[in-house]
């Protein structure tokens, strides 16, 4: 006799769909019999520069210790982060990617009968983390593709324990300013933990986008999450972190898996954090690449959503799925975002200049075919 194990799962889990990542290069190569080296992937917001040379050197040095468990407390990385982020060591929580931090929050603070509030067109992990623990996901309609913070505030009720906000937002790239953030934080009830997801904050230097760290001291119900997957180029190693009050950090560490960040990731993240030249190059490449894609969209008569991330959403003015498939046949992988409620858009990662040109030419060809 076999049971229906889908029906036996939590109701919230039954309603979820598995997370779908950007299509891997090898998968497309197998499907279309293409040379993997000929494929351009601009689908997963990865850093086109590759990893920092200093991070790669640190990984090589750490290889001899693979038989040993990593430092479960991540002391070296926490110390560097505490110094750079102007916090105490006991305010830092390390995660297996920043999505691990989001799940730790859900595991610690959400349960059946409670809810989390987040925006439409927001990161797919928010509903996954929320519903996986049996809590209710309260999705607030977006405003001009971004967070409607007053509406999100109005959605908070006595059963709300967490609000997820992202600045800049993924997948839209939209952002809000310091005054809007401060006004929001002032009015959020003290019993609600605000998770400020800053996965792309490094790309927004010099803009009007606020630094969440500037608000930590004033708001004990604020947690800032960040990652080494984007601007630091360590996506494969899965390392992120959260910054909060010591009390919140202590709670998260109670539900954190032992050794959740591996030794190679710890070593690489420490080295990457010190490589200011690499980070500056990443920012410069992203800025010029964004300008290149915007100019290309303008020539094609397409509109786009202004972005502060390392990606941009282009509006095709039609259902994007056939164009996405056409680009795949041209050996170019981007990201359809219909599952985010954006069926006419494609999200495109900023690549190297040649990759951006290849994408724009492929897009021109696919659109011309109709």
Swiss-Prot record:
Cofactor: pyridoxal 5'-phosphate
EC number: 2.6.1.9
One Pfam family here: Aminotran_1_2
Keyword Transferase set for record: yes
Keywords of the record: Amino-acid biosynthesis, Aminotransferase, Histidine biosynthesis, Pyridoxal phosphate, Transferase
GO biological-process terms attached to the record: L-histidine biosynthetic process
Gene3D superfamilies per UniProt: Aspartate Aminotransferase, domain 1, Type I PLP-dependent aspartate aminotransferase-like (Major domain)
Pathway where this protein functions: Amino-acid biosynthesis; L-histidine biosynthesis; L-histidine from 5-phospho-alpha-D-ribose 1-diphosphate: step 7/9
SUPFAM superfamilies with a match to the protein in the record: PLP-dependent transferases
InterPro entries per the UniProt record, alphabetical: Aminotrans_II_pyridoxalP_BS, Aminotransferase_I/II_large, HisP_aminotrans, HistidinolP_aminotransfase, PyrdxlP-dep_Trfase, PyrdxlP-dep_Trfase_major, PyrdxlP-dep_Trfase_small
A molecular function GO annotation: pyridoxal phosphate binding
UniProt modified residues of type N6-(pyridoxal phosphate)lysine: 230
Catalytic reaction(s) noted: L-histidinol phosphate + 2-oxoglutarate = 3-(imidazol-4-yl)-2-oxopropyl phosphate + L-glutamate
Subunit organization: Homodimer.
Family: Belongs to the class-II pyridoxal-phosphate-dependent aminotransferase family. Histidinol-phosphate aminotransferase subfamily.
NCBIfam families assigned: hisC
This protein's name: Histidinol-phosphate aminotransferase 2
Source lineage: Bacteria, Pseudomonadati, Pseudomonadota, Gammaproteobacteria, Pseudomonadales
Encoding gene per record: hisC2
